[in-house]
């Protein structure tokens, strides 16, 4: 079984989403000793944001300048990693009400018409169903249902929308929120998220 582990936090060892996503991978590795894990650290090795040149350069039979071809190849590598994975674990912090730009750049490389989705007579159809996706969403404040800031949460909601669009309709999402509200709140949020990670079922 192949697992793709993607981290979008820029906070390194201080990151809650990284801590919990690593715990998830450890949990699944313990259940599946032969697990083949690919790791993509989007802070250490960010993908370039999409450009018009790259979109054109990704078309069949395109002739590209070396720098454009390098960018196209990076996107294809990210897409191939995603397509090959049976399980995808994503560390997704909430920055300024949405995902980190590094994680968004990765998403832009895996949402590819004709590969992970297509348009038909009835609209969009996801082509990447069948994968298990587990995401950790960390939030400094309180954005859960019923909170005053719930409508401003565009990390978990965006992830659910994007994943459903490509056919992954039942992602497992672990939320750690309130981590910026003081040391005790952070510890409670982290402990709860780690408990949820430890309780994940085998794939």
From Swiss-Prot:
Pfam families given in the database record: Flavodoxin_2 (PF02525)
Question: Any binding details for the cofactor?
Answer: Binds 1 FMN per subunit.
The alphabetized UniProt keywords are: Flavoprotein, FMN, NAD, Oxidoreductase
Q: Which InterPro entries does the annotation name?
A: Flavodoxin_fold, Flavoprotein-like_sf, FMN-dep_NADH:Q_OxRdtase_AzoR1, NADH:quinone_OxRdtase_FMN_depd
Coiled-coil region:
none
Q: Which cysteines are joined by disulfide bonds?
A: none
Binding-site list for FMN: 9, 15-17, 138-141
Q: Which cofactor does it need?
A: FMN
Instruction: Please state the Enzyme Commission number of this protein.
Output: 1.6.5.-, 1.7.1.17
Has the keyword Lipid metabolism been applied to this entry?
no
Protein's UniProt keywords contain Flavoprotein: yes
Annotated GO MF terms: electron transfer activity; FMN binding; oxidoreductase activity, acting on NAD(P)H as acceptor; oxidoreductase activity, acting on NAD(P)H, quinone or similar compound as acceptor
Of which family is this protein a member? Answer: Belongs to the azoreductase type 1 family.
| Functional summary from the UniProt entry | Quinone reductase that provides resistance to thiol-specific stress caused by electrophilic quinones.
Assembly information from the UniProt record: Homodimer.
Query: What name does UniProt use for this protein?
Result: FMN-dependent NADH:quinone oxidoreductase
Q: What is the lineage of its organism?
A: Bacteria, Pseudomonadati, Pseudomonadota, Alphaproteobacteria, Hyphomicrobiales
Name of the gene this protein is made from? azoR
